[in-house]
Amino acid sequence: MEKKTGTTTVGIKLKDGVVLAADTQASLDHMVETLNIKKILPITDRIAITTAGSVGDLQALARMLEAEAKYYQFTWGKPMTAKAMANLLSNILNESKWFPYMVQIIIGGYVEEPTLASLDPLGGLIFDNYTTTGSGSPFAIAILEDGYKEDMSIEDARELAIKAVRTAGKRDVYTGERKIQVITITKEGMKEEFVEFKE
């Protein structure tokens, strides 16, 4: 079987924090391989990354970023900011452009301020208030465009992110809609949850 994969990941930045959401379905051709893949990985207690693409590549990049964050903390005595980590990740991806990591990444965090960025496989870096990646992006971005407000609460952003991923899952066969991983990051820290739907 040819391995065809897809997903939808979403990021929303607010004045009080960042919300990341992703489906948990992995596909093998036209078959659902599992409903329990974590597509959002914490790097520190204040920064996480999502991926659309190769989960193995994401895991390798996450290990690199974790090591760099620990080294930075040890060297400078303070945590690496999400903006600095996004720039570091951009450089790592760009250095590998001839043998690219097969990923589209969203990085979000709150160290000194809320930060959200998306990166393409060659290291292209865009900081934004909201973004999506993956095969369900055309559906998810429409929900974000319609519902995003700069002054919205974390809870409203969480609901919007879940709605965006679920909507994508209803229209994109490679995005799951039954279980959604959500990570919320504020100045108080990070909270991870899994939201499940019966239908």
From Swiss-Prot:
Activity regulation, free text: The formation of the proteasomal ATPase PAN-20S proteasome complex, via the docking of the C-termini of PAN into the intersubunit pockets in the alpha-rings, triggers opening of the gate for substrate entry. Interconversion between the open-gate and close-gate conformations leads to a dynamic regulation of the 20S proteasome proteolysis activity.
SUPFAM superfamilies: N-terminal nucleophile aminohydrolases (Ntn hydrolases)
Top enzyme class: hydrolase
Subcellular localization(s) per the UniProt record: Cytoplasm
EC number(s) reported in the record: 3.4.25.1
Family, as annotated: Belongs to the peptidase T1B family.
Record's protein name: Proteasome subunit beta 2
The organism's taxonomic lineage, starting at the top: Archaea, Methanobacteriati, Methanobacteriota, Thermococci, Thermococcales
Protein encoded by which gene: psmB2
